[in-house]
Amino acid sequence: MAKHERGLRFQPTGGSKAPQIPTGKKQRLSIERLANDGRGIAFFEGKTWFVLGALAGEEVEARVLGAHGKVVEARTERVFSASELRRPAPCQHAGRCGGCSVQHLPHNEQLALKQRMLAEQLSRVAGAEPEEWAAPLTGPEFGYRRRARIAVRWDSKAKKLEVGFRAAGSQDIVAISECPVLVQPLQPIMTRLPEMLRRLSKPQALGHVELFSGSSLAVLLRHMAPLSEADLTILKDFCAFHEAQLWLHGEGEPQPVDDAQSLGYHLEQWDLQLAYRPGDFIQVNAGVNEAMVAQALEWLKPTADERVLDLFCGLGNFALPLAKAAREVVAVEGVQTMVDRAAANAASNNLHNTKFFQADLSQPLTDAEWIGNGFSAVLLDPPRDGAFEVVRKLAALGAKRLVYVSCNPATLARDTVELIKQGYRLKRAGILDMFPQTAHVEAMALFEASQDGSSDPTGRP
């Protein structure tokens, strides 16, 4: 599934170069502890090894994926002495597929790893600890993913079409017969997809496939050459059998074969329907997404006489539920097409107390028209880069309460430093288990303005 293992950035150190370890070499290692990304850490012959699929205290044989300087990245090939925490991998493709990098850890241990990662970032970078730790926000550990991207590639030497997910540490494609983290309605589509694609007349012109599950099922095919009528019939019949929409992505933007069809998802607690298109960002975990929105509103506590600001609003995932509680919601997003989509979603849900604006939120906030007389509360849901320029000006907007939803604890911790400088205190924080079986951490933090306007480096009043 989705890959969350990130490559390391190396800097030249000068001096004589140590001989590099060749890719593919196998080495027996003793794993001392876990890194924040879930990989095992070992030390051998002056080098630090980061080993996928290994746990603290284990003896493993690892295969080198890449090396530079004193850092080696590797993957577990064999476990000689297993940790008592290790469980059998729930997926038959474990160790080959590049997704689900911590599925060998029980779910409660995965949560502990993510909690530790968030706490360490806040402590190390911001010197802060929340006054209260919220319980992890969780859902089912399997069958949660409502969107998936399937790699498709023509092997000209073998004269065959490869269909599956990217392998761990390489661009190879691993054939996948089933994926335990996909929602159940997508499983039969996933299983039968390779056979259908191999029936098409120009397999070398096929790109990736995306699967969607929401208010309806959908299959999107990226193709680099026009499809024949026979191929189009095969695709239509496949989607009709699975009761799924068919979307095609040739030149230009993806389009449904049936113009009347659209993609969307429902937020049941607020009876809201949000439409989106392929390429738009949505949270892949529907259950945790709805619980996240509910928790954000519970923490922010918007009232019927308050003006609330939603930054990085996307499709309106937070803005529309906020509009059910607040007097007015001003929502800002960097991409104009998403602004238009959010405004259309508000209109289709008969919400008229929302205003949507486009602004580059990576730049310092200026006297934008949407600021007006300020806001009682602010919600932020930035991308991985965080919201540094935005948080530098939030105190000037008069907000007493801030909820920060983060997909990167490192930038959340960095931005926490700035918020504390402005007189906010870190009231509450917790993890959101949006991606079970991976080490990817989502988090939510509540900041409140100190009554006397003073700040404390610990985040406490």
From Swiss-Prot:
PROSITE patterns noted in UniProt: SAM_MT_RNA_M5U, TRAM, TRMA_1, TRMA_2
Domain TRAM: residue ranges: 20-78
Binding site for [4Fe-4S] cluster: 91, 97, 100, 179
Enzyme Commission number: 2.1.1.190
Molecular-function annotations in GO: 4 iron, 4 sulfur cluster binding; iron ion binding; RNA binding; rRNA (uridine-C5-)-methyltransferase activity
InterPro entries the UniProt entry points to: 23S_rRNA_MeTrfase_RlmD, MeTrfase_TrmA_AS, MeTrfase_TrmA_CS, NA-bd_OB-fold, SAM-dependent_MTases_sf, TRAM_dom, U5_MeTrfase_fam
Enzyme class: transferase
Residues the record lists as binding S-adenosyl-L-methionine: 283, 312, 317, 333, 360, 381
Superkingdom field: Bacteria
Keyword terms of this UniProt record: 4Fe-4S, Iron, Iron-sulfur, Metal-binding, Methyltransferase, rRNA processing, S-adenosyl-L-methionine, Transferase
Reaction(s) this enzyme catalyzes, per UniProt: uridine(1939) in 23S rRNA + S-adenosyl-L-methionine = 5-methyluridine(1939) in 23S rRNA + S-adenosyl-L-homocysteine + H(+)
Active-site feature positions: 407 (nucleophile)
Region: Disordered, residue numbers: 1-26
GO biological process: rRNA base methylation
Pfam families found in the cross-reference section: TRAM, tRNA_U5-meth_tr
Function recorded in the entry: Catalyzes the formation of 5-methyl-uridine at position 1939 (m5U1939) in 23S rRNA.
Family: Belongs to the class I-like SAM-binding methyltransferase superfamily. RNA M5U methyltransferase family. RlmD subfamily.
HAMAP family: 23SrRNA_methyltr_RlmD
Protein name: 23S rRNA (uracil(1939)-C(5))-methyltransferase RlmD
Biological classification of the source: Bacteria, Pseudomonadati, Pseudomonadota, Gammaproteobacteria, Pseudomonadales
